[in-house]
Each structure stands twice: as structure tokens, then as C-alpha cells.
Amino acid sequence: MANAREILNRMRSVQDTQKITNAMYLISSTKLKKSKKMLEETEPYFYTIQNIIRRMLRHMPEMEHPYLNSREEVKDEDRTRGLIVVTGDKGMAGAYNHNIIKEAQKWMEENPNHRLYTVGEVGHHYFVSKGMPVEEQFHYTVQNPTQHRARLISSTLMDEYERRQLDEVWILYTYMINSMSMEVRMERLLPLRKERFSANQLPSDIPMEDFEMLPSPQAVMDMAVPEYITGYIFGALVEAFCCEQNA
């Protein structure tokens, strides 16, 4: 039977553990609020870019552009698809990392002609340990998502898409629905899905106004799409970070 001193030591140990756990929770909560605030502050700009693309496609539904070209001449089995997988940096988030990796493996089995890109140490180490080639690891901590890092990621993938090294670009991340639930999301970034910018997704009070695109529709699209892709990746990084903190 434990003596009084041993019991006191165990009580102190439990109390110390509780203090550490509470401190970790407070830190995670603070980081989560900070990241959500950062996303909310940048959303208006990226929504504006998205609306520019919507307006262009609404006025010119038959517009042709490399970012809209689905490359139908390339057979499905010959298409090279790039996948950005966003995981955590640590394995302490339980099902959070497991669900992402499980979904990534399923996708890669269905798309054998793929190129893998990782953000987050957990995913990178897992795929490497399983002998799965990683095309590029973006050495950015998931703990600090920034627009600059999102822009570097989008620039790399868009460059490979433009040089036809990739026929499609996808991203896999976790989206926080609310503080109690989250879900794994897979989205194709390139080529753009026109239905994401369809007129019926716009508020009904937006008029079908005439407008002029200078210097040309192609130039406007050249500017708008990279900004849109960067905004989507940044949002995915922030959502993934919030999910990890909340897991």
C-alpha cells in the first residue's frame, strides 16, 4: 500500500499534468483565434478576385484560356495529376492526420500517374517511409500559414501546369465546419471548374452590367487566376491549421 508521501507525489504529478494541459489548450485557442482573424481580414480581397472571374465568365461563357482548358485531348489514363497534401507538423492530432493520409492514399491508388506535394512534416515523413516519391516538400511549418507561403506554393504548381508537366492540380486538406466537427476536403484547383463561377452562384441583386477589360480579357485572367489560386491555398492552410489546433 502506498504511503502518504507517495500519494502526495502522485497528486502533485496529476496537478502538474493538468496545468500543462490547460496551458497547451490556451495556446492552441489563442493561435486558432489569431489564424481565423487573419483569414477574415484577407477574405474580402480574394472574394473580389473570385467575383472578377465570375463576371468575366458570365459575360463571356465561351471564353478560352489555358487555366480553363480541360485538355480533353489527353486521355484520362495519360493525365498527370498533382496533389498538394496538407497535414500537421506533429502526430499529436490523432484522427486529423490519419484521415488526410488515408484519403490521399485512396486518391493516389485511383490516380497512379500522379505527382505528390506535401505541406506538413507528418504527411511528408509518412509517404517517404512508405517509399512513395514526393515531388516537392514545401518546408513551411503549418503552425504559421501566410499569404507569402501560399503564393510560393501556387507559383510552383501553376508553373508546372503551364509547362504541361501537370494536367490537373488538386489540394487535400481539412476544413473546420465548427468547433465540434471537421471534414476532409478535396478540390481541383486547375483547370478551373466553370461551375464554381456560374451566374446562379451570384447574389440575385447583382446586375448584368457591361464592363470593359483592359488591356484584354486574357490579361485580366492571367492576373486574376493566380491570385484566386493563392487565396484558395491560403484559406486551406489556415483551415488545416485551425483543425489541428482544435483536434
Give each language-model segment a name:
Residues 1-247:
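C-terminal beta-strand-loop-alpha-helix "lid" module of Rossmann-like NAD(P)-dependent dehydrogenases
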